[in-house]
């Protein structure tokens, strides 16, 4: 499954084509489906042995397609619907981390009517402005001053009504993949810009 209806549709199509070509090269019988809200019902009729999910963002990484496939009884790659839902929503994820005494940068939810002075009373520059449920760093801004804060808020409100401001933590960035509850080696990320996309 590739494409979808999120802000990351185009990158999903590129990723999906790459995965499709790799699976075909591995001599597997593969069908690709450029998924949209109008053809989601087509999945069941394909009668797949397994679905390789290459959807990004809303609908693809937030548990929506995973729950649909679970309801159809079709196995798929990646995390389950509940963990996908939790991990995609930054507020929900932070709540669970804090409930389990795992440190996470402090944050507040904001709206169009939030006064920037209230944000500045809670955070020192730089800080982060981002939507709660987008992937690939869509809408993520590290703001250095009031003007860049206004821009970040305005741009985020165009794509989401659910936006947070978060404490900026300077430092090195690492990632650890997990497959079947087994942690893979730690990888240091060296982004070309201020943070990894």
Protein language model annotation of sequence segments:
Residues 96-104, 155-158:
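Basic phosphate/pyrophosphate-binding loop/patch that engages nucleotide-derived ligands
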Residues 12, 106-107, 127-154, 173:
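Glycine-rich phosphate-binding loop of ATP-grasp-fold ATP-dependent ligases
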Residues 97-98, 122-138, 160-171:
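ATP-grasp fold ATP-binding core
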Residues 1-88, 92, 99, 111-118:
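ATP-binding N-terminal substructure of ATP-dependent carboxylate-amine bond-forming enzymes
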Residues 144-197:
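Phosphate-binding site of ATP-dependent enzymes
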């Amino acid at each position: 499954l590739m494409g979808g209806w999120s802000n990351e549709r185009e990158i999903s199509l590129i990723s999906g084509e790459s995965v499709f070509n790799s699976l075909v090269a591995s001599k597997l019988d593969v069908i690709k489906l450029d998924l949209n809200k109008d053809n989601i019902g087509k999945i069941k009729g394909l009668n797949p042995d397994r679905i390789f999910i290459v959807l990004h963002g809303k609908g693809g990484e937030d548990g929506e397609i995973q729950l649909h496939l679970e309801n159809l009884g079709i196995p798929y790659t990646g995390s389950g619907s509940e963990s996908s839902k939790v991990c995609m929503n930054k507020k929900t994820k932070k709540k669970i981390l804090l409930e389990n005494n795992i440190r996470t940068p402090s944050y507040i939810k904001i709206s169009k009517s939030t006064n920037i002075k209230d944000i500045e009373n809670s955070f020192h520059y730089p800080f982060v402005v981002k939507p709660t449920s987008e992937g690939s760093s869509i809408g993520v801004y590290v703001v250095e001053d009031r003007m860049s804060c206004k821009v970040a808020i305005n741009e985020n409100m165009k794509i989401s009504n659910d936006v947070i401001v978060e404490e900026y933590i300077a430092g090195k960035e690492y990632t650890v993949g997990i497959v079947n509850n087994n942690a893979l080696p730690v990888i240091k990320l060296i982004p070309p810009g201020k943070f990894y996309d």
